Amino acid sequence: MQVLSSLRSAKNRHPDCKIVRRRGRVYVICKSNPRFKAVQGGTHKKR
C-alpha cells in the first residue's frame, strides 16, 4: 500500500478504484487489482 500526500492521481488509475474514508484516513481500494491500494492522512506515531 502506498502512502500518498494526494490521492488525485491514485483514484484514476483503474476503473474499479474506489475512495473510502475510515478512521480519519482516506483510502483508495481496488479489489480487481490490489496493487493500486493507497492511503492518505492519519495520525503520526510518537517516538
Curated annotation (Swiss-Prot):
A biological-process GO annotation: translation
Gene Ontology MF annotations: structural constituent of ribosome
S-S bridge residues: none
UniProt-listed Pfam families: Ribosomal_L36
Protein name per Swiss-Prot or TrEMBL: Large ribosomal subunit protein bL36B
Keyword Transcription set for record: no
InterPro entries linked: Ribosomal_bL36 (IPR000473), Ribosomal_bL36_sp (IPR035977), Ribosomal_L36_bact (IPR047621)
Keywords assigned: Ribonucleoprotein, Ribosomal protein
Gene Ontology CC annotations of this record: ribonucleoprotein complex; ribosome
Tree of life domain: Bacteria
Family: Belongs to the bacterial ribosomal protein bL36 family.
